Curated annotation (Swiss-Prot):
CDD domains: T-box_TBXT_TBX19-like. It comes from Drosophila melanogaster. Residues 20-35, 50-60 have a biased composition (Gly residues). One of its GO terms (molecular function) is DNA binding. The gene is byn. This is T-related protein.
Length: 697
């Protein structure tokens, strides 16, 4: 094998007839005898010869062959080979190439050209930094036959075609100094393999033939051309128009960064999705953050443009304006900057519990938009209301607090209210409603609907006693874009001391004089959005008997707001302080039936056993003289006087207490409202409460 085609690729104008000494091996009849060791070829205008089994014979000028580093250096005394004895060329990603070699690697060739994977990438050392070198990549056809894929393996399949004339790729950075080639690995990522002679600088290969890439390092810039060839047998491949071996396909999909779309969802690495890195862990706050923040006065707040970007490095970019426990750019143990809303790029695990943000700042200060005090590690490392500007909406709390002296001393050191429950919303939520950073553009601040919010740059103390803000959204559905307080999209644990989940005025729900927080936070509530409290709403459930009696209260907030109320707080929300008045403690989350005994038949009398010691208990007190036992029979779809109503009176031995009279008979002594919404009747007047069938939805 001669190197005339190599040198012609380097310098096409040089005449090379009869004065090239070649290093044989690896191609033609040599059969790869010289593979594994580079051959150095000198073009000095005097010697001529031919390759013999990988050993180059140079005539004239005292050939000296010396082994060095596992490759042959061939040349006359005083030749430039003496300068390149320390030359080393190594293949990068050799382990990956070996994995493909074990499977018989395949490379796709197309009409328009297809890039290789793995990419031939080499590292050079020992070059003369001041000398000029050209790097070439040659694809040598190493077999004299074709290949075919039969029964899961490659077997010889016929005579080989004539190899292309010039499958040599010149590195686009050639020629260049040795210092340039040694600076970083030399990559042939732009090589394109084709099966057509389109002449676009692409490498033409014959399909179903095996090739071996070889790197040629040519020293240029002098009269004598010096070629060093490095074959890499582990890079051999068969050119194909479509992958034959499925294992090769899987391996390429696994390691090729441009083929990640073919991966299954469970196999895709988290780093493919940058928005996942915006979510951090919710970690319980240590006490030293609260102590350190109480003694630090916050500097003037930054503008949105200064504090908008995500800071992923540590120390942070804004360390000059930050105040930390120890230094300006201090970091906690998880690599996050304490003085900015930074996001560690490696924290890609989605958080295992719901995230609820109270207030505008992620560190719990309701009016401090810059939040330059050290934020506890339990702060959700997410772009909160400040970073929601990138999604198309600017929250009101940021725009109002970035104008003036919001970052004052009273707004620091108040982490206990926001992070007492590891990042969940506390009971005393700030009047500035929460803004959740969903990756969309429809969120808005609750201040738009909140009548109790503080407008303008008015300082607010987070630690002061604050009212619970009521939800004043004009739309009672949870699909409303303005419904931003305690979003029901997250399943909030029923033990968390967050404010009333539905933020509805309690006077509207229960008809009592007790409101949320004494009624101070219920201003501006849309009274017309919910049913009046003086009427009865009858809505039977499939699991309840059809003769149950319902008291004079509307459906409570879960049903009125069209939630699936059976799963919220497991029907025992009153035990955890969800409902603010005493009468609500006995109401169930879905419908409000009386607690009746288990009747064996719907028409048997039932016993009402409910006593309360509040102002509403008067309606449950029994008549001291007599009790009324009624039997309700409904045969038609409307309440008429023709119904058979049997009224029995019996004197009770225990007139002042509740108890079963006997045989399942019970005393019914609860005044109830008529189904159609009429006012409640007197305590000694009874009306059958089985509703008309036409009202059953």
């Amino acid at each position: 094998m001669t190197t005339s085609h190599i040198l012609s690729a380097v310098d096409p104008t040089t005449g090379l007839s009869g004065n090239v000494s070649g290093g044989g091996g690896g191609g033609g009849a040599g059969g790869g005898a010289g593979s594994g060791s580079p051959q150095h070829v000198t073009h000095n205008g005097h010697g001529h010869g031919h390759g013999l089994g990988g050993v180059a014979a140079v005539s004239g000028g005292g050939a000296s062959v010396s082994g060095n580093g596992g490759h042959r250096v061939v040349g006359g005394a005083g030749s430039p080979n003496e300068l390149d004895r320390n030359l080393r060329i190594s293949l990068d990603d050799r382990e990956l190439w070996l994995r493909f070699q074990n499977l018989t690697n395949e490379m796709i060739v197309t009409k328009n050209g297809r890039r290789m994977f793995p990419v031939v990438k080499i590292s050079a050392s020992g070059l003369d930094p001041a000398a000029m070198y050209t790097v070439l990549l040659e694809f040598v056809q190493i077999d004299s036959h074709r290949w075919k894929y039969v029964n899961g393996e490659w077997v010889p399949g016929g005579k080989a075609e004539v190899p292309p004339s010039n499958p040599i790729y010149v590195h686009p950075e050639s020629p260049n100094f040795g210092a340039h080639w040694m600076k970083e690995p030399i990559s042939f990522a732009k090589v394109k393999l084709t099966n057509k002679t389109n002449g676009n600088g692409q490498i033409m290969l014959n399909s179903l033939h095996k090739y071996e890439p070889r790197v040629h390092l040519v020293r240029v810039g002098s009269e004598q051309r010096h070629v060093v060839t490095y074959p890499f047998p582990e890079t051999q491949f068969i050119a194909v128009t479509a992958y034959q071996n499925e294992e090769v396909t899987s391996l390429k999909i696994k390691y090729n960064p441009f083929a990640k779309a073919f991966l299954d969802a469970k196999e895709r690495p988290d780093t493919l999705y940058p928005h996942d890195t915006h979510y951090g862990w919710l970690i319980p706050p240590p006490t030293h953050y609260t102590a350190a923040a109480a003694a630090v006065a916050a500097p003037p707040p930054l503008s949105i443009a200064q504090s908008h970007g995500l800071v992923a490095s540590c120390p942070s970019v804004s360390s000059a304006e930050s105040v930390g426990p120890s230094s300006g750019g201090s970091c906690d143990r998880y690599g996050r900057s304490l003085s900015s809303r930074s996001v560690a790029p490696t924290r890609t695990t989605p958080y295992s519990r719901p995230r609820v943000v109270s207030g505008s700042g992620s560190n719990g200060s309701a009016g401090n938009a810059s939040s330059t005090s050290p934020q506890p590690p339990s702060a959700p490392q997410t772009p909160t209301s400040l970073h929601s500007t990138s999604t198309g909406s600017v929250s009101t709390s940021v725009s109002s607090s970035s104008g003036g002296g919001i970052g004052s001393a009273p707004s620091t050191g108040c982490f206990s209210s926001s992070y007492a429950q590891s990042g969940f919303m506390s009971v005393d939520a700030s009047p500035t409603a929460s803004v959740f950073s969903y990756p969309s553009s429809w969120q808005s601040n609750g201040n738009y609907w909140n009548a109790t919010s503080v407008p303008g740059p008015m300082p607010m103390n987070v630690c002061s006693g604050r009212n619970i803000s009521s939800h004043n959204s004009p739309s009672p559905t949870n699909g409303s874009p303005s419904y931003t307080t305690s979003s029901p999209s997250y399943t909030i644990h029923h033990l968390t001391p967050h404010s009333h989940q539905y933020n509805m005025a309690q006077t509207d729900i229960y008809g009592t004089g007790v409101g949320v927080g004494g009624g101070a936070g219920t201003t501006g509530s849309p009274q017309a959005a919910y049913g009046a409290a003086a009427h009865q709403v009858y809505h039977p459930t499939p699991t309840s008997p059809t003769h149950q009696l319902y008291t004079n209260a509307v459906l409570n907030a879960p049903s009125a707001l069209s939630y699936s109320a059976s799963g919220w707080h497991n029907g025992s929300g009153a035990e955890y302080g969800l409902y603010q008045n005493a009468a609500a403690a006995y109401y169930q989350p879905e419908y409000i039936p009386l607690e009746i005994g288990y009747a064996t038949h719907p028409l048997e009398p039932v016993d009402v056993s409910k006593t309360l010691d509040d102002p509403q208990a008067a309606m449950y007190k029994p008549s001291d003289e007599q009790g009324s036992v009624i039997t309700l029979e409904c045969a038609s779809s409307s309440l008429k006087s023709s119904h058979d109503i049997k009224i029995e009176s019996s004197s009770l031995e225990h007139a002042g207490e509740r108890g079963t009279v006997g045989g399942g008979a019970a005393v019914v002594s609860v005044p109830t409202a008529v189904v159609n919404g009429a006012p409640a009747v007197a305590a000694d007047t009874w009306t059958p409460l089985t509703p008309p069938q036409s009202t059953l939805q």
